[in-house]
Amino acid sequence: MRFLCLHGYAFSVEVLQQQMEPITAHLPSDWEYEFLEAGMEPTELMLPNLKQVPKPNYSWYNFPYPEDVEEAYERLAAYVESDGPFDGVWGFSQGGSMAALLLLMHQAEHPDTPYPFKMAIFTSAFLPHSFDNGVVSWDLTEKNTLEPTYLPGRIDVSHGKKLDWKKDLHTSIEYDMINAVKDELDFPVDLLLRWRPSDIPEKIPVPSVHVRGLKDHYSFVDESVYELFDPDMARKMTHRGGHNFPRYNEELVHFAELIIDTVVSLY
C-alpha cells in the first residue's frame, strides 16, 4: 500500500510524520507513506498563537478566498497526477479537508472514471470548501458590524436571505474568524461556502476510515466528512483525545484494525 499523507494547518511534513509514527508502527512494515507539504504560509489572523507553533509550518490556504482554495486544489491534483498512483490518501485536519475536496471534485467532474485513491483515511478532518456553492461577500457597515451578501453558486441557488450566515454551519466558522480580526482586513471579503452531505448526488463510493477526538476543541470537526461517504464502505471511531491522533495503545490498535480491515475489503 502506498499512501499520500496531507498535513493540517500550520503543520509540516516532519510534524505529521512524528504524529503518525505511533499508528504506522501498528501497520504492515512494507506500506509506504509519501508526504506532500502545503504551499502557503499560515497567518496569525487565523491562528493567534502561531508564534508558539514549531517552524517551519505551512497551510493549504488561510481564509477560504476562492483563488487560494483553487490554487491549493490544483497543486494537490497536479501532484497526484504526476507522482501517483497512490493506493490511499490520509489527511489530518485541513489535509483531510483537502483530501475530501479532491474526491468530491472527481465525483463532480469525472463520475464515470476510477477515483484517484482506492481508500481514504481522515483524522480530525472537517468539511472542505466548495467551488459550486457560491460565496458570501462580507462587508463592514457604518456601525462596524459585518454584513453578508450571498452570491449564488451552481448548487445553492435558493439560499439568499433564508439562512442566518452568522449561525449557519457553513459560514459561522468564517464569520467568527473575520469578526475577530475585522480591523485588520480589507473589505469586502468574498469567502467560499463549504460542501454539505446533502449537496452531493450520491455518497462517495470510496472505502474510508474516520477518526476524531471526543475532546476536539474545534466544533466543526464532527461527523460531516463521514456523511459524505457510502456508509456501507465507511468505518469510524472516536478517541479520548482532542485535535490530534489517538495516543492510547488500545485506541491505536483499534485504529490500525479499521485501516487493515478497509485494505482487506479492497481485494
From Swiss-Prot:
Upregulation: Expressed under high amounts of nitrogen via regulation by AREB. Moreover, components of the fungal-specific velvet complex VEL1 and LAE1 act also as positive regulators of expression. Finally, the pH regulator PACC acts as activator of FUB expression after the pH shift to alkaline ambient conditions.
Enzyme type, top EC level: hydrolase
SUPFAM superfamilies: alpha/beta-Hydrolases
An annotated GO BP: secondary metabolic process
EC numbers: 3.1.-.-
MF annotations from Gene Ontology: hydrolase activity
Keywords noted in UniProt: Hydrolase
UniProt pathway annotation: Mycotoxin biosynthesis
Superkingdom of this protein's organism: Eukaryota
InterPro entries: AB_hydrolase_fold, FSH-like_dom, LovG
Family matches, as Pfam families: FSH1
Null allele phenotype: Impairs the production of fusaric acid.
Stretches of the chain forming a coiled coil according to its record: none
Active site annotation, chain numbering: 93, 183, 243
Family label: Belongs to the AB hydrolase 3 family.
Role description: Hydrolase; part of the gene cluster that mediates the biosynthesis of fusaric acid, a mycotoxin with low to moderate toxicity to animals and humans, but with high phytotoxic properties. L-aspartate is suggested as fusaric acid amino acid precursor that is activated and further processed to O-acetyl-L-homoserine by cluster enzymes aspartate kinase FUB3 and homoserine O-acetyltransferase FUB5, as well as enzymes of the primary metabolism.
Name of the protein in question: Hydrolase FUB4
